[in-house]
């Protein structure tokens, strides 16, 4: 959650009634931003104060004509958009903190998880780590017991296991935070047995 450096806003739970940019329509960012807004405030983000610009265009509006108050960005850390910023950016923008103890945060933490926005990821923007939120990613498939589906998903899981160390060493830095463990899923969801078998043997 990005706002102007001189904004009185400090926390995510203070964005109600702010002019938000939530990313392009039907994008993952727009879905996450509008879901989080609804969970925080029990209502949808007002259409009159919600825009659907790209991150780059929204930042121009944020710091230029100031027709946007908050730009919501959902990206793997470090997000290139922020990591590439010059030191002067610190005088123009800042990131909002997520207060997990605030009463409005309880519903959000049923869907999203706590995260740390690291100063090391954005040295030109942050002087200290900030509490934030993370979106968990899932690969979802129909529970087809067809041989082609079983074969494809088994090969995918096996390849992930075999190449996991390479992904962590040479892939996007976010891979270093990924674990191959099989955490408990929310009610109504279960692991696809062929994938579960492969991953279980991989981490054994």
Predicted regions and their residues:
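Glycine-rich, charged/polar anion/phosphate-binding loops
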Residues: 56-59, 80-81, 123-126
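Periplasmic-binding protein-like
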Residues: 90-141
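Segments of small-molecule ligand-sensing domains
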Residues: 126, 130-204
């Amino acid at each position: 959650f990005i706002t102007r450096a001189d904004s009185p806003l400090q926390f995510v739970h203070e964005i109600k009634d702010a002019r938000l940019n939530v990313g392009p329509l039907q994008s993952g960012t727009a879905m996450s931003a509008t879901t989080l807004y609804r969970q925080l405030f029990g209502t949808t983000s007002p259409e009159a104060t919600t825009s659907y610009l790209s991150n780059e265009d929204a930042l121009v509006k944020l710091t230029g004509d100031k027709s946007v108050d908050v730009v919501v960005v959902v990206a793997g850390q470090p997000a290139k958009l922020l990591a590439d910023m010059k030191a002067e950016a610190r005088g123009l923008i800042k990131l909002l903190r997520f207060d997990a103890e605030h009463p409005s945060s309880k519903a959000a933490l049923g869907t999203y998880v706590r995260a740390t926005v690291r100063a090391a990821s954005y040295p030109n923007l942050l002087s200290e780590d900030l509490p934030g939120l993370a979106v968990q990613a899932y690969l979802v498939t129909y529970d087809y017991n067809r041989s082609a589906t079983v074969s494809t998903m088994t090969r995918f899981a096996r390849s992930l296991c075999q190449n996991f160390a390479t992904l962590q060493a040479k892939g996007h830095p976010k891979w270093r935070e990924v674990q191959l463990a099989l955490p408990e899923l929310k009610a109504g969801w279960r692991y696809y047995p062929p994938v579960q078998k492969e991953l279980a043997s991989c981490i054994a």
